[in-house]
């Protein structure tokens, strides 16, 4: 019995060694593509071991398929990481950024202030008589233009009353410069009665504004400033003409031609400057 057991053990060892050396490995299949087939180990869903006859081409295809499947997945992961980094968490221009709040508040305040001024100017330019009162109080086209530009500039979008703003401005400018047509006649004509009667109808507040405008223009004219300097100070050509009328220039045209010519030159320069800045 002992001899039989030894012989059986030797037989089992020798048979196992032969089977082991006769079965080609995966590496040997790649190095020796002439091998016809091999047993490729596989497992089913239940965990049972299966044997499948396959060749080296299938093995290479499986390895290539694994590499082709892994690389795109890795690239997709990298792209996903890059895209996440590219998404801005807090933009500098975002409304939620506290750094932009002071600028936005200042922008809103300027817009409200400009609209308030426009409301006041609309009240001052309702009709021709109201425009005349505003002109006597020193309101110039440049004042109205600055308010118009402020509203258009500080609005986050085009204001719905843009056409109305432009219409108010154009009508005021046309009426304003229409008052100087009589200066080109010989002798120059100035409607003194119209403005004197309007002056009598003014309230105390309007009378104060009228006197202040005349005093301001009088100081600048008496300094002998040039047209460019007067324009920079926004001296009203209409108040300038009213000042000359108050001083009796139009009653003695022959002796005051130089003053009237200076007024006409200033009106021309003022209008050209206004049109250039449109």
UniProtKB/Swiss-Prot annotation:
Motif RxLR-dEER: chain residues: 49-64
Signal sequence, start to end: 1-18
Stretches assigned to coiled coil: none
Listed GO CC annotations: extracellular region; host cell endoplasmic reticulum membrane; membrane
Role according to the record: Secreted effector that completely suppresses the host cell death induced by cell death-inducing proteins.
Similarity section: Belongs to the RxLR effector family.
Protein name per the record: Secreted RxLR effector protein 151
Organism of this sequence: Plasmopara viticola (Downy mildew of grapevine)
Name of the gene encoding the protein in the UniProt record: RXLR151
